Amino acid sequence: EGNEYLVRKNVERLSLSEMNSLIHAFRRMQKDKSSDGFEAIASFHALPPLCPSPTAKHRHACCLHGMATFPHWHRLYVVQFEQALHRHGATVGVPYWDWTRPISKIPDFIASEKYSDPFTKIEVYNPFNHGHISFISEDTTTKREVSEYLFEHPVLGKQTWLFDNIALALEQTDYCDFEIQLEIVHNAIHSWIGGKEEHSLNHLHYAAYDPIFYLHHSNVDRLWVIWQELQKLRGLNAYESHCALELMKVPLKPFSFGAPYNLNDLTTKLSKPEDMFRYKDNFHYEYDILDINSMSINQIESSYIRHQKDHDRVFAGFLLSGFGSSAYATFEICIEGGECHEGSHFAVLGGSTEMPWAFDRLYKIEITDVLSDMHLAFDSAFTIKTKIVAQNGTELPASILPEATVIRIPPSKQDADIDIPLNHIRRNVESLDERDIQNLMAALTRVKKDESDHGFQTIASYHGSTLCPSPEEPKYACCLHGMPVFPHWHRVYLLHFEDSMRRHGSSVATPYWDWTQPGTKLPRLLADSDYYDAWTDNVTENPFLRGYITSEDTYTVRDVKPELFEIGGGEGSTLYQQVLLMLEQEDYCDFEVQFEVVHNSIHYLVGGHQKYAMSSLVYSSFDPIFYVHHSMVDRLWAIWQALQEHRHLPFDKAYCALEQLSFPMKPFVWESNPNLHTRAASTPQHLFDYNKLGYKYDDLEFHGMNIDQLENAIHKTQNKDRVFASFLLFGIKTSADVHLKLCKDETCEDAGVVFVLGGDNEMPWPFDRTYKMDITNVLHKMHIPLEDLYVHGSTIHLEVKIESVDGKVLDSSSLPVPSMIYVPAKEFTKEIEKEAVRGTIIRKNVNSLTPSDIKELRDAMAKVQADTSDNGYQKIASYHGIPLSCHYENGTAYACCQHGMVTFPNWHRLLTKQMEDALVAKGSHVGIPYWDWTTTFANLPVLVTEEKDNSFHHAHIDVANTDTTRSPRAQLFDDPEKGDKSFFYRQIALALEQTDFCDFEIQFEIGHNAIHSWVGGSSPYGMSTLHYTSYDPLFYLHHSNTDRIWSVWQALQKYRGLPYNTANCEINKLVKPLKPFNLDTNPNAVTKAHSTGATSFDYHKLGYDYDNLNFHGMTIPELEEHLKEIQHEDRVFAGFLLRTIGQSADVNFDVCTKDGECTFGGTFCILGGEHEMFWAFDRPFKYDITTSLKHLRLDAHDDFDIKVTIKGIDGHVLSNKYLSPPTVFLAPAKTTH
């Protein structure tokens, strides 16, 4: 296979003959003046310009920067260069210069001025040292000004800037997030090699004329390949993008021009970005090795990226766009008082002929360590001061970049739960229906027939066969027993089996057998002798009944002990009590010992004294019951984890045996493991969160008790004095049952059995703490008072008999003599949870107001409108727009209301509260009612439409000397879709679905805008104008509902276990004062005290509450389930990057096929005005266009257009320059991990 591809090798690992072929091929290529020569191909990048077409009057550079197709264009470009080089005699692909590792110098291959041919001994100039730019002059060559940044050698334990930032790029799981991080890091090499030299790598116009460009971009492309391999390891798509879909079918120029400009038929034919993903198949090259800093793909993910994600991190975010020049940006972190510390830096590559570009998401650079050194928290008050210097040394105005934002990414364990599809939910084996049983049996039959490494024999051999420490020198079995990582090894092992079952057609996750429940026989799945296979129309042996052991040419057997059904059997039974004692433990390693030994009991009770059975460490995994047993075992660990979380104790980490948790487990980590999923999950410390492994359990109840009830049951057992037999266990090279007797004098009673699972090839193990068996009931049965245990010379003692699995009685001294431990009763005081103090004012649905409520509100509003003080209507309404009361540093006045920014919800929460408190001061006993416009309505609320004696009908605008008016549009009432298909419902449901506050805010705000536009219509003094909207009393009912929607989202976040009273994005903006609420002129002490975004999340502290937080009749848990159901379908979104346009407008768009057939795509509104505060979102507003595409019979990846029309509220059509072209991205159905 290797002969079919050109191999790109590390430039430092080229052989003499390979270097020789590259040098001479490139010399020939530089002399070639045709379209296949070096300078012709170098011109593809920028100058002389060829785009948009060679004959266009105004041309620009063809290279794509600052957009999602940057990697695609440059992948094709390196192929263009590589194949030309190959045609000129090169025997290998374009070598790559790996700058991700610490370097001391630029490789000689590209730095030396001369090259001495090792075969002819003739010295010639090194063509890779520089390039000629003949279109300027014959004497013009590229220059280099190498920066010391390139030769960074970090202190021990730290990595270089380049490595850290590439690792951050590789961490991303969304292609467009990866792309922006990759591109900006790549820019640094351009900057650090070219410096201030004009004809250099640091100038977009001339970069491609320096031969180092191609070695640099070979490495950039290799990093993309590494990311693709990581995506495959993660189980995510590596060969297509789900974002920027509109760009993926646009041919890349000038490659698509063909002859005479491009003489390469392959790059002409395969010139669409979508062709670039499968580089080996389409372009026939590969890399010698895919590593970073000597870390393999698996190690990058498991040992580095996951480790980084386990930490709380803070980033500065920059929304970048082109400004016609290369530049270097540095920034400082500054606190009040002027003290500043160096933050970090990044580069932009540009030139005057560059194609216009703007990213639609933030470039992130980590500042965690800087803040830590400054003793600052992520939400401390600090500013980021950015300095931008152009390539020629000119300092550019800081305003060329939007203000940097601060983002916090909490440790990954705090991420949202992964939505697990039904076929990844492990259920009780007794709850399976006939179809489930048939499916599992058919899948296991196929797994058993599979003789590959995905088949049963290989999987079963992982447990007990002699494979470790390496297949080359096998000494013992790989399974981990008798050590703290026993649960982790078996968690990933069961996952490995389950993945194979799914690969062979199983649509049912591995069920669990709850052996603590009463029973008289094994479950049907495990015990039926045969089953009917509907596919083959045959009656076949039940594959779960036994397993074949190829190496022994025999089948597994079972010797089920009657005690299995005697010691199980519900509350009071031995297994129940043993599991309860296990779950009682609060230290992970204490839990693990109890857990493992209880699990051993089932191996013994099913396998008995048989060799090829569950009771043998070597052969237990060949009996399929093993996997159903271990599904229950893993579930018990999950229950303990839930208990620990309930106790506010560590549940996703251990503070013991730390040395074992960081080492990848064998054989899963080996390259011979064909399952990339389990290979990536082979490190114990990453296995605590089973949701991230792609499965969960139907429930975590134990004998009908939820976690809270289970904890109470544990407390009941702890409320009594107890005595335990304590065993210090270690490996004895065999499976054995240890029979315990409690004796007084010569009288003895059976006290229980401890089973040890082992074998002659077991990995050596000793527990470092004891296994405890409760013998309190035996003492009571023998009428031995607990006090007698303390009597000197007492004859109370323990005796053991040890019987190996083959029936031999072992010397009782094979294990240390157990001791007795007395544990006194614990007392528990039940904590009484205090409910959050409810606000004194309740906001009701406007349609549920009583006549007395309505009268009270109208009377109070009339009094507020008559009040000319700072707490009167005119003053409060002016907070939003005109008269202008906020000022820039230069004195220019602007409207204080915050729109198009993260604090929009917070600012309007305070304004609504300000008006509400004014109403309360004038006699209202109810809060501002909310108008729920997400439900179907045919008219505006009666509260605001009755004309007679109604202060809510309109209000006077003193500053304009006129009254407010409304001009509702037809679409406000005439939505043809109802219920969960209606316009407002769909917009708000999409907002509520978001789990990041900034994602929610954008969807939420733009959804709210439509009410402003459609109620106010063309009225200049109404809801549709930012300047005067707050003078219409309806504004406050609208914003009461808007605030309630935010409150619903907050309740959803709380239910999801995610931040709800804080945000992890744009943190620096959330700590800034919200004017004018913070000013001394504000008479409201409550809004003044909460006049930042950060302090206004908790609305209970503002003294109000809602009558309920239901959404369309759904409670918060029901709403969350409904939102998840919505996500179970593929959806396609148009993304609009919105910013200030200085007026209110409606945006309508159609989706059109390339043949011109169009259908309505959607509509949304922008609320603005001449005096609005400047704003720009840092991420796209998403609009679902799935239905529109279905109407046109289009798929997300098809070629289509989105035609946008922007209309001002006065009906005039506005220029499309106000909006960037929309992007398209796919949100795949959440049905697979």
Swiss-Prot record:
Pfam families, per the entry: Haemocyan_bet_s, Tyrosinase
Key words, A-Z: Copper, Disulfide bond, Glycoprotein, Metal-binding, Oxygen transport, Repeat, Thioether bond, Transport
Cross-link 2'-(S-cysteinyl)-histidine (Cys-His), sequence positions: C63-H65, C479-H481, C897-H899
Disulfide bridge map: C51-C62, C176-C243, C334-C340, C468-C478, C589-C656, C743-C748, C886-C896, C998-C1065, C1152-C1158
Taxonomy, superkingdom: Eukaryota
Region called ODD, residue ranges: 1-4
Chain positions covered by the region annotation ODF: 423-839
Glycosylation site positions: N392, N538, N890
Protein's UniProt name: Hemocyanin A-type, units Ode to Odg
Organism: Enteroctopus dofleini (North Pacific giant octopus)
Upper lineage: Eukaryota, Metazoa, Spiralia, Lophotrochozoa, Mollusca
